[in-house]
């Protein structure tokens, strides 16, 4: 998902306008030179925007430039490879997301083991996806949709932004937990998938909330539920899918990670400073503009989320026989 150029520039301008925080004096001699923050997606999407907000904050807090380095491709695995190939010295970091966990389970022969080669540093943001349908679909609720899908196995078309994508897996988890058969049709990105959904050639889609808000508000698409465990502040009257499928959670999270064996004191320093940013009202507001909720906590908290999602998505792919082509 990409944001319009005007929105993207507005958010970047907002990052530059964040109040300069005093540099933290610490005995730790880090950083003494620029730090690279690798992003596995092109400029303009939420991952890139979150990275630039955090990079700007850390640059001001720690007195050295944190430079965003976009390495898009292969479900963010190219970006991960750049980090696991770098020295474990804290000068090459990764803006990681749910996509990396899913890609690590989906693709074969990646040349790295994500859970062994990457150490989670700190969460940054949590955001929901939304399950939307074309208005021609008669179902007005999740239970109605499940009933229709059971009555018409293999006939309801589920569009996604591509094979192995996070939105596809949100749909696959729904299919598995609801025990329904939807026909998955992958597209080359959100734009063509949305075109067919709006045109009625596809029936249902799971996608990031910022992409869908305008279509939902204008009635061009009907929202049935959000993929997070709880409701979203953006659409508080919209139920979570988990209210009807207990345990369903396909949250999209973003955070900062480093090469494994990065010194613990560097990990702890970065965690402390990122949490300080997430507690800053201006930075928190910027995250909210792209649908994010601050994901505060220790590196151990983030590691627990990281490990839990790795297990969940790997088990889903095995149980549902989802394999890369």
List PLM regions with ranges.
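N-terminal twin-arginine translocation
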Residues: 1-7, 15-29
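N-terminal (or domain-start) structured segment
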Residues: 26-116, 155, 179-206, 296, ...
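An extracytoplasmic/periplasmic, membrane-proximal ligand-sensing/linker region
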Residues: 32-34, 176-178, 217, 240, ...
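Stable alpha-helical elements in mature extracytoplasmic
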Residues: 46, 50, 54, 79, ...
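Active-site phosphate/pyrophosphate- and oxyanion-stabilizing loops and adjacent acidic/basic residues
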Residues: 52, 56, 81-82, 172, ...
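Hinge/capping helix and adjacent helix->loop/strand transition within the periplasmic-binding protein
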Residues: 85-91, 105-192, 241, 246, ...
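A ligand-binding cleft/hinge motif common to bilobed small-molecule-binding domains
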Residues: 100-109, 175-177, 203-236
């Amino acid at each position: 998902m990409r944001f319009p150029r005007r929105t993207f520039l507005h958010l970047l301008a907002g990052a530059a306008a964040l109040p300069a925080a005093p540099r933290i004096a610490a005995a730790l001699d880090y950083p003494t030179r620029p730090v690279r923050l690798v992003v596995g997606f092109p400029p303009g999407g939420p991952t890139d925007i979150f990275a630039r907000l955090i990079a700007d904050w850390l640059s001001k807090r720690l007195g050295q430039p944190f430079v965003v380095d976009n390495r898009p491709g292969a479900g963010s695995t190219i970006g991960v490879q750049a980090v696991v190939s770098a020295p474990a010295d804290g000068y090459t970091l990764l803006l990681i997301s749910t996509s990396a966990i899913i890609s690590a389970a989906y693709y074969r022969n990646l040349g790295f083991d994500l859970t062994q080669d990457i150490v989670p540093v700190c969460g940054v943001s949590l955001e929901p996806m939304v399950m939307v349908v074309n208005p021609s679909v008669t179902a007005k609720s999740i239970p109605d949709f499940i009933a229709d899908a059971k009555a018409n196995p293999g006939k309801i078309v589920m569009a996604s932004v591509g094979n192995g994508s996070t939105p596809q897996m949100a749909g696959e988890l729904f299919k598995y937990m609801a025990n329904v058969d939807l026909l998955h049709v992958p597209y080359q990105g959100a734009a063509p998938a949305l075109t067919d959904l709006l045109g009625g050639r596809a029936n249902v889609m799971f996608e990031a909330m910022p992409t869908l808000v305008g279509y939902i508000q204008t009635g061009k698409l009907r929202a049935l539920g959000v993929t997070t465990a709880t409701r979203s502040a953006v659409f508080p009257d919209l139920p979570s899918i988990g209210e009807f499928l207990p345990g369903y959670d396909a949250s999209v999270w973003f955070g900062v990670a480093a090469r494994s064996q990065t010194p613990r004191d560097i990990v702890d320093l970065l965690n402390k400073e990122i949490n300080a940013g997430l507690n800053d009202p201006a930075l928190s507001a910027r995250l909210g503009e792209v649908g994010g909720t601050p994901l505060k906590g220790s590196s151990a908290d983030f590691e627990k989320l990281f490990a839990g999602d790795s297990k969940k998505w790997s088990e889903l792919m095995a149980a549902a026989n989802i394999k890369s082509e």
